[in-house]
Amino acid sequence: QRQMCIRDRYKEKKGQVYTDNYRSALSTDRYILRGDAAGETYEPRFTFHGFRYVEIHGLERPLPLEAVKGIVLESIGVRTSGYETSDERVNRLFNNIIWGQRGNFLSVPTDCPQRDERMGWTGDAQVFARTATYNMNVDPFYTRWLYSVRDNQGDDGSYANYIPVVGFPPHGA
């Protein structure tokens, strides 16, 4: 029985991998290969990962790069802005912001898609809201999430630090 293992990894410097910020998240998928000579496709169905690099091992030979495909999941879509300068570093920064928004706007506005919790932190969502509205058509996304904010308002008028409230005391204000 052959098993392929896929791990998300953040590579900070050449040859160095940093995963401490994952906390308890393993960010590891294991797939038992059928042994199909024509090839196999693996796509996780009940999880998602935020990553920059992936590590695949357990195969007899390395996969060619074109055989590996990342799929972007997001709850927004239509980009409403563009930005380009003569400085490629600034262009890269803007594109990284767009990718960060796409990776963190999946059902609720999260602060990081790679860790062991993906909660709709109200402070992060509020701070980034203006930028988000310039970048993409987020009206339906924020409208739906703000209904959840209202639905989760405490009897005393307080709001939780994250919405929806799940599993932990909300420690709201």
Predicted regions: what is each one?
Residues Q3, R7-Q114, G123-D124, P140-T143, ...:
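Extracellular/oxidizing-compartment recognition motifs
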Residues V127, Y159, G172-A173:
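Extended, hydrophobic alpha-helical segments in both membrane/secreted and soluble proteins
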Residues F94, N135, H171-G172:
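Short acidic-aromatic active-site loops that bind/stabilize oxyanions
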Residues Q1-R2, P169-A173:
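Short, intrinsically disordered, charge-balanced linker/junction segments flanking boundaries
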Residues R130-T133, Y147, D151:
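Generic alpha-helical structural context detector
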Residues E117:
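A glycine-rich phosphate-binding loop feature that marks nucleotide/adenosyl-phosphate handling sites
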Residues L59, V127-V138:
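Well-ordered alpha-helical scaffold segments within catalytic/enzyme domains
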